Amino acid sequence: MAELSEPEGPVDWKERCVALESQLMKFRVQASKIRELLAEKMQQLERQVIDAERQAEKAFQQVQVMEDKLKAANIQTSESETRLYNKCQDLESLIQEKDDVIQNLELQLEEQKQIRIQEAKIIEEKAAKIKEWVTVKLNELELENQNLRLINQNQTEEIRTMQSKLQEVQGKKSSTVSTLKLSEGQRLSSLTFGCFLSRARSPPQVVKSEEMSKISSKEPEFTEGKDMEEMEIPEKSVDNQVLENNRGQRTLHQTPCGSEQNRKTRTSFATDGGISQNSGAPVSDWSSDEEDGSKGRSKSRCTSTLSSHTSEEGVQCSRMGSEMYLTASDDSSSIFEEETFGIKRPEHKKLYSWQQEAQWKALNSPLGKGNSELSKKEQDSSSDELNKKFQSQRLDYSSSSSEANTPSPILTPALMPKHPNSLSGKGTQLVPSSHLPPPKLRIPNVFSISVALAKRHLSQPQLSSDRMFGTNRNAISMIRPLRPQETDLDLVDGDSTEVLENMDTSCDDGLFSYDSLDSPNSDDQEHCDSAKKVAYSKPPTPPLHRFPSWESRIYAVAKSGIRMSEAFNMESVNKNSAATLSYTTSGLYTSLIYKNMTTPVYTTLKGKATQISSSPFLDDSSGSEEEDSSRSSSRTSESDSRSRSGPGSPRAMKRGVSLSSVASESDYAIPPDAYSTDTEYSQPEQKLPKTCSSSSDNGKNEPLEKSGYLLKMSGKVKSWKRRWFVLKGGELLYYKSPSDVIRKPQGHIELSASCSILRGDNKQTVQLTTEKHTYYLTADSPNILEEWIKVLQNVLRVQAANPLSLQPEGKPTMKGLLTKVKHGYSKRVWCTLIGKTLYYFRSQEDKFPLGQIKLWEAKVEEVDRSCDSDEDYEASGRSLLSTHYTIVIHPKDQGPTYLLIGSKHEKDTWLYHLTVAAGSNNVNVGSEFEQLVCKLLNIDGEPSSQIWRHPTLCHSKEGIISPLTTLPSEALQTEAIKLFKTCQLFINAAVDSPAIDYHISLAQSALQICLTHPELQNEICCQLIKQTRRRQPQNQPGPLQGWQLLALCVGLFLPHHPFLWLLRLHLKRNADSRTEFGKYAIYCQRCVERTQQNGDREARPSRMEILSTLLRNPYHHSLPFSIPVHFMNGIYQVVGFDASTTVEEFLNTLNQDTGMRKPAQSGFALFTDDPSGRDLEHCLQGNIKICDIISKWEQASKEQQPGKCEGTRTVRLTYKNRLYFSVQARGETDREKLLLMYQTNDQIINGLFPLNKDLALEMAALLSQVEIGDFERPFSTPAGHVTNQCKVNQTLKQVIEKFYPKRYRDGCSEEQLRQLCQRLSTRWMALRGHSAADCVRIYLTVARKWPFFGAKLFLAKPITPSSLGSTFLWLAVHEDGLSLLEYNSMRLIVSYVYKSLMTFGGYQDDFMVVINNTHSKDKPTEKLLFAMAKPKILEITLLIASYINNFHQQKAAFHHLSAPALLSAQTRGPQARMMGSQPLLSSSRPTKGPTLL
């Protein structure tokens, strides 16, 4: 300043400015130094403060300890001190002695270890010798086996020559003599199938007929059981009546005890078409679909049936004592074997004698059509008259050997379809051909408990056999429970006594008119009659009641009301028909819900619906290569085979041991679940050609050749065809039958390195993909399929030891394309590190590993490029960079394996993860953070270790310059640094409720990157552990938001070892319920456990999830999130869940809150709306996570409607019925009935339920009474009359709009609406004072009158050319099958049982159903195509598959139940209801007889 004030001389401002700038720079340098010194000093002071605080805390603790000691200690004398000193000396000496003992024990342990090692070596030497001996012995057996095969072939040729000669001799004889002689040969065939009844048990001893009659006379208690066994009904057609008469005479002549034996054979109802099923179909009857019509074949069928019948009787009698409690058939095939025959389900409460009369008329009609129509006079006939008729026909029953399968009355509800009209029109679709084998169904012999036993052991009055059903339904009701007590509307106008009988005794009297049918003699009948009188005299006669007038009126309307009114406006419905065929859905959302399925294709195998493709079939998707030339050759071979296999051909017997070859001559295969598929009946080893791999071939060379029957999906008609496959020379050829192998094959499949084998759903099918085609194959049993897979994999040079070990389970730690070098050979493979094992595959898409390397305790290190294998690899000229890196893996007791890696980043990542997987303590690999974690792991996370204070493990305000973990590429390293910046922004910015979207966006973007790049999941977990390891002052919010972000992160995924170990330790050290930080640590611990239990998530957190975590203190709740679930009656239930809750767990919580049964019993499912806003719903699978559903729905909604506010629309969850089972209706809860009523009302409103206008009003009145209550009449006072009248009118209009069908109210004038409201009010007032439960019961009783109640209807248009026309129709999916209904009237066109559905699903842009027409010879399969919207195709496909698989699960559940277990289950009624099962006997069910407890 002094220089500036001097006036002398001019001032050089430029120099002055430069000088000042230099001074400024000096000041800045000094200031920066001062800042650095201050920063260092501050850090030093902070450390000192921390140390001081820690020391002060320790000192404070010591002071407290000393104070406690001073307070507790008394003044000790010198004697007490001496005593304590002596005690201390004694303890020290005792410790020394213990140490000596421990050392001695350790020495002994070491000696024992050495001894065990020596013994192990000796055992290994012995095992090697034994193995060598076994190998030599097997080779000798193999040579001997080959010699035996040659001998067998020679003898087979001789047998064929003899049979041809025998056939010529037989042709010269008369038809009667030939029939008698053929019976012996066919008996052998039928005996083979007769033994199916006893498979999975010891072979039964066949009992002679005389011995059987003795047994039955000595053991009278079995007679009642036999009454409930199966009976025979003859199959009578135009062309074989005479033969059946002859057969009947021979049966009477050959079986003296025929009347008793015939009670033991199985029965089934004759269908409308009059086609009975042949329970004893011979082998030759199955072998060709074209061979029926010759008289010789009819004769052979008759004789074979007779012998099969007698053989099965002996088997059943010999095992009666051991099998009297069986409740299901022995075979494990589908439940549809009992429902194949399209049997007509009896309507509820009708006496069983009417059904018996229908059977009797069907048997005596020349064409067997007496069961199609029943007159009222026939229906009203008494049970006594019918019993006399049946007794007069007992001779026909005992003399018939070609029987139809008729279920016994106790199984009638189980075996009959629900829909009585399903056989009209083209109802013959339900009737399979008699060529199919019958179901092996045995009636549970629960009625063999004698009266004396019941009296002695159960302390009950003596019972007659016709009362046993009402009192001992234990095993029977478990097979198929009876439907609930509902009123049969057809009997409303009858006498009140008849109504009472039908309501109260439908299970007792009606069904047991059967019992008098088979009474052995008059004495037994008199005994039954006397027993009846005793039973009837025990309980008091219940009072007779008529229906109330209001209920009778509703039932009277319902009798004729289940139909459409003639006049209503269909224009509004027709307008929407074409529009509904064109919706699409959001791919992002549906890819999560349906697991990337678009329109899948299913096939029916072993009674189960098995998915064979997740996308629709195209024209060439199934790879049919049956060219025209091969077809012509197949026709030639077929005609030759027909000429060779005449009536007396032993062709079937030659292959009769193998069920897989029974239908080899047929072009279309019998479905695999139509016969037994035990491996013991598969192709015998001696019969296989030389190319077939023998099961006893345990040599070192793996088999590369095989032949046998497989089922192949055809090309144009998607049906299964049985073909004889021959694998030889790396090529898979297929023929029509084994005899055609000398001709040109029908097709061939070239197996090359580009082929892939993918197992289908539930390991039922195999998808073989080549360069040109995709083939779908299946076998008769899983074991045969596994053998084929193994041989095919050997051909494809897949060295997997066990073909069942597909893609290893678990989350891969690392994966990538590497070059593996071993023993000088190099190969480019896809490597995946899972756990402590390195798997390598041929390609990334391959599911079968080529091999694996166990890494535990292996030596993993980086090596220089000095090994010979590397140099050889470079010399070979492969396409690998010359600058590659090498990692060597040296497992214990194995040679080294070299991995060649192209980049340094990738090499570092692989080296670190391989080292960790090997369990190495090497801390010189990986990043600095990883090395520190490894050191902590070596010291087991010692809390006092200085490693915890390392800056790399602690919170830092500055960004990181390199990732905390090793990453395989530079791009991922850059992303990791950006990820840390995003976490810093989330942590440092204060949470503001109005601007919460900023934090939501940051969290979603960061976690989405980690889901897209799984390599970054370890990185973000390590970053959040680092940023939450230091406690900030309470006024800084940073660390708390770090804990919140960590909670969101661990709810999605978990890091790998050892970072998972570090995370658990970090959470454990910070868990403290007294602080907010500690509460979040406890919440994170819960999230870690749940994520480890249910697996990783698929979608980023939703807005709702992030809001709940940031603002609503999630640590206070075990289920921190909640969402409303809507019901069909307009109410909702809020249900809680966490980040890992699956749909199955969510539904368990919902059912507990609402008092409903499990979805498997109730048929209810959870649905979501479509994000696009269209009227679509998506059914949720049980393993999807609720949070993923909400998140994907939000993302799809934003994409499809970007302009709307994201926070306003959320996913809507609806809980409603998806699968309806009439057998489960008995255990419906009140809530289920209510929701079912409202769901039915929704169908009525939308025109998916047929009812006329009168019945619609009655139903609307019932719903109004349930929802609103009693109808409020207008007040009579002038003051309030106007206001109240307006209120009443408004209520009536709302009811009409809510409960009355749209099609009936659209277009109505004001006057018509007023009259409609007046009629509704009249019906509503009639319900005054009645409870909601009564109204719900009546509503469902009326609704169940429609045969398709509970079915889901889909609008479809048949694709021309089709026999169904080209107009719109309804596809009704219900528990018994698929039905086609007329569009306007909803009358049945045709029904198909699920058994006849071969393939169903997407075909191009349409819905495809392939039907097995077993009754048609000209067209054994039929493919139906329907134009539908793609979402509806997916929905109907999954719905059909669910029905089929649910029946299969029910069959499996009931299969192993026994009567003693069921008897014990009855005593546990309340417990069974708690577990969701149904009680076997309802305590409220009225009965006339005493009940067995």
Curated annotation (Swiss-Prot):
It comes from the Eukaryota. The keyword Heme does not apply. Residues 20-175 form a coiled coil. Pfam families: FERM_M, MyTH4, PH, RA_2. Residues 703-797, 811-919 form the PH domain. It is found in: Cytoplasm; Cytoplasm, Cytoskeleton; Cell membrane; Cell projection, Lamellipodium. One of its GO terms (cellular component) is cytosol. Residues 208-230, 374-388 have a biased composition (Basic and acidic residues). Residues 1121-1451 form the FERM domain. Kidney. Reduced expression in patients with focal segmental glomerulosclerosis. Gene3D superfamilies: 1.20.80.10, MyTH4 domain, Phosphatidylinositol 3-kinase Catalytic Subunit, Chain A, domain 1, Pleckstrin-homology domain (PH domain)/Phosphotyrosine-binding domain (PTB). Keywords: Cell membrane, Cell projection, Coiled coil, Cytoplasm, Cytoskeleton, Membrane, Repeat. GO terms for biological process: negative regulation of actin filament depolymerization. Residues 202-230, 245-335, 363-439, 613-705, 1474-1493 are annotated as: Disordered. Residues 245-260, 267-281, 389-409, 421-432, 676-698 have a biased composition (Polar residues). Residues 955-1110 form the MyTH4 domain. SMART domains: B41, MyTH4, PH. One of its GO terms (molecular function) is actin binding. Self-associates. Interacts with TGFB1I1. This is Pleckstrin homology domain-containing family H member 2. It comes from Homo sapiens (Human). The lineage of its organism: Eukaryota, Metazoa, Chordata, Craniata, Vertebrata. The gene is PLEKHH2.
